């Protein structure tokens, strides 16, 4: 599991506990008013800069923590809820959510970008906890635990600390002397000793993992045509229990395939090729159903940012060629190539993959053709040499005479 340095760790917010106690949601003003009985934290879903925000869900629970005598921390009283009145909250991301780029965001948000500017973005959702029904008996520090439920889905890497520790600092009101909330601090880990490193955060970091799938066409042999189009069908096969995008979720498609052609192919009509190839994105529904595409030698199709762990099948319509399939990532245990069926299959896409379909068409040139051409050619050559010899001899005789 990768481990990154928090992009906002060096920011001043992490040097000041009170500021860290008030997370900043995307687009929020630094001076915004916050209800002292409420605590807001963020959910950051990091992904490739070209990926569409997936419709993936995450679930959180708020519960009283345990007392830490060494730090004078008390267990939080019951009653803390999310603003919908429940102790468990599920959120679902969508393409309409706020997105911040890794080279232009409020660094007070502790987003776990990889540090390479321009290649990542994060969708941001805010969650709010309500302490208005909590009875804090005395001034002090009260601890709660925020926990994120995790799964084994390959498409999502969860926060390395699925439990965060929320300390609520309670003081006495200057007028009534009643206990009131002064501030709140969210800790990355459970701090139980005064000497431990204390990292303050503004929320949870998860990563949406994606990979590119590409396939390309090549031909070989002395009878192979480099201008001929070959028909392919690419189909996505989701694994049981794995993350599955919405049918309308779209994937960017790049590469070098002809989106339109001007004339009929030897096998396929211009209308057929143009109807199949004229696209720059494909929806999840199209890929589940299977999408036809036509490629000729030297062309490649790339489907970008498929969710990691998803399966696929690419099949080439067989013709009077001998197909051979090769993949550039041989470590992928789920990949199989059936040359007889001209089909490449993978039960789980786990890295960027390029599959090469090579069709061979060759054969021996008939020897009778060679003999028929070679005999007259040899006779012509003999005649030519004879003429040259006679001319040279005559010239020599004339010179001597």
Which residue ranges define each predicted feature?
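Solvent-exposed loop/turn and edge beta-strand elements of beta-rich ligand-binding domains
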Residues: 2-401
């Amino acid at each position: 599991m990768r481990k990154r340095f928090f992009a906002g760790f060096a920011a001043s917010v992490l040097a000041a506990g009170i500021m860290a106690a008030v997370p900043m949601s995307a687009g929020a003003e630094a001076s915004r008013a916050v209800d002292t009985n409420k605590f807001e934290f963020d959910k950051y879903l990091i992904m490739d800069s070209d990926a569409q925000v997936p419709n993936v869900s995450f679930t959180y629970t708020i519960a009283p923590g345990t007392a830490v005598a060494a730090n004078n921390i008390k267990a939080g009283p019951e009653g803390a809820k999310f603003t919908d009145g429940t102790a468990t909250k599920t959120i679902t991301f969508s393409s309409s959510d706020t997105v911040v780029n890794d080279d232009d965001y409020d660094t007070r948000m502790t987003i776990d970008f990889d540090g390479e500017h321009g290649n990542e973005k994060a969708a941001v959702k805010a969650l709010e906890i309500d302490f208005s029904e909590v009875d804090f008996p005395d001034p002090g520090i009260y601890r709660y635990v925020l926990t994120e439920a995790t799964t084994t889905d390959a498409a999502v890497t969860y926060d390395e600390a699925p439990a965060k520790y929320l300390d609520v600092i309670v003081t006495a009101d200057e007028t009534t002397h009643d206990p009131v909330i002064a501030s709140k601090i969210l800790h990355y880990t459970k701090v139980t000793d005064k000497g431990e490193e204390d990292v303050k955060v503004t929320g949870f970091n998860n990563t949406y993992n994606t990979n590119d799938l590409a396939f390309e066409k090549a031909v070989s042999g002395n009878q192979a045509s480099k201008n001929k189009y070959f028909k392919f069908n690419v189909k996505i096969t989701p694994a049981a229990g794995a993350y599955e995008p919405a049918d309308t979720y779209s994937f960017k498609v790049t590469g070098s395939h002809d989106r339109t052609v001007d004339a009929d192919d030897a096998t396929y009509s211009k209308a057929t090729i143009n109807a199949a190839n004229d696209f720059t994105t494909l929806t999840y529904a199209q890929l589940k159903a299977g999408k036809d595409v036509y490629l000729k030698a030297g062309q490649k199709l790339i489907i970008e940012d498929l969710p990691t762990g998803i399966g696929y099948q690419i099949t080439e319509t067989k013709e009077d060629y001998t197909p051979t399939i090769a993949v550039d990532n041989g470590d992928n245990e789920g990949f199989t190539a059936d040359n007889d069926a001209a089909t490449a299959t993978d039960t789980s896409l786990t890295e960027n993959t390029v599959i090469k379909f090579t069709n061979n068409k060759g054969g021996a040139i008939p020897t009778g053709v060679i003999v028929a051409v070679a005999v007259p050619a040899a006779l012509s050559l003999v005649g030519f040499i004879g003429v040259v010899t006679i001319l040279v001899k005559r010239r020599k005789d004339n010179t001597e005479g």
